[in-house]
Amino acid sequence: EKIQISRVFDEMGIDIIEAGFPISSPGDFEAVSAISKSVKNSIPCGLARATKKDIDACHESLKFAKRFRIHTFISTSPVHMKHKLNMNNEQVLDAIKESVTYARKFTDDVEWSCEDGTRTDLDFMYKTIELAINCGAKTINIPDTVGYSIPEEFAKTITSIKNNVPNIDKAILSACLLYTSPSPRDFG
């Protein structure tokens, strides 16, 4: 189905098709590879955690396309850094630098996301975004990974990023929304 959908998107003139997460399974790797071979106009994109192994899988699956994007990410919220990654701020910053720089070896089109962005300390988020852009990310994605934010807060976060990240004008800013109804915060 992914391949059929990507062909329709390609014919429609969709700019970017985020085709999958190649390292996640052999099926996803094959689907991303097939999409990268079949699209003629759209730019296929693969998702990768901030590791060389993930980025290598993205590159291997996307290399058939004339142009492609690697979308790398790492968790930046305190709860994810502590319990999911077992990393501190400096380690996360190092991982951002290494992963974006490494992805740039394969393509000029790198997207970076601060996973669980809406629960990330804003001052730390500004640092991560500025660093990712300085390392070559052309698109910055702010995801509401767990559906935490309400629309007004999310809008304030985006405005705050625009006002506090000095090099934000050098990147495209995007958002990934996961709004639940009702908000998880409604339950305390």
PLM feature segments, named:
Residues 21-22, 44, 48, 89, ...:
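Hydrophobic alpha-helical scaffolding
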Residues 179-188:
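Single conserved hydrophobic/aromatic residue that forms the stacking wall/gate
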Residues 27, 50, 185:
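Short, glycine/acidic-rich beta->alpha junctions
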Residues 2-12, 56-82, 89-110, 117-168:
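Alpha/beta enzyme core
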Residues 15-39, 77-84, 142-151:
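Glycine-rich, proline-tolerant flexible connector loops at the mouths of alpha/beta enzymes
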Residues 17-19, 44-48, 68-72, 110-114, ...:
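Hydrophobic faces of well-ordered beta-strands that scaffold small-molecule active sites
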Residues 34, 38, 136-137, 168-171:
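Generic alpha-helical hydrophobic packing signal
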Residues 31-67:
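Glycine-rich, N-terminal phosphate-binding loop and its surrounding beta-alpha-beta segment
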